[in-house]
Amino acid sequence: MEFTKVVAERYSCKNFSTRKVEAEKLTEILEAGRLAPTAKNSQEQRIYVLQSEESLAKLDKVTPCRYGAPTCLVVAFDKNSVFTYPGGKRDSGMEDAAIVATHLMLAAANAGVDSCWLNFFDPDELAKELGLPENEEVLMILDLGYAAELSLIHISEPTRPEPIS
């Protein structure tokens, strides 16, 4: 799909069917995350694929926002591998993970897979529930799947400024 069309047509799906994301599409989505740029090419991102009933139940304990998605990606980063910016006040972890997550989300749209970016959860609680190492910090969850047939797709009117001239 043409990039501006992907960006314009992507929306946050909040009612998923039980249809599974095909393995080849999931691989394509994950590859986009792997190829995402990171500061100094540190590649500190960690992407956890949750698909089993057990892992999705753990997710459901910490957020009401899975919306029935059959696949969820948890995007985290290794705090020990981040690039620290001059002055030592900030590091690349959160922004690199956000770049990776954005690549995943747009690759999903390009593959015809619906998604929803989730931040409504306690990252420490989720890390504990999933048994993640202490050096990893969770940024977000990306719900993946296909919209339920009867779901109402709400596409908001753009609130962005007029196009740049």
Kindly label every feature range from the protein language model.
Residues 3-20, 25, 141-156:
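C-terminal helix-cap and adjacent tail motif
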Residues 25-31, 35-100:
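Glycine/small-residue-rich phosphate/adenosyl-binding loop
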Residues 77, 120, 146:
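Short secondary-structure boundary segments
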Residues 100-109:
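Acidic, metal-associated active-site segment
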Residues 112:
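Structured binding elements
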Residues 115-119:
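Short beta-strand segments at enzyme active-site cores
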Residues 126-139:
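Short, electropositive alpha-helical surface patch
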Residues 153-165:
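Single conserved hydrophobic/aromatic residue that forms the stacking wall/gate
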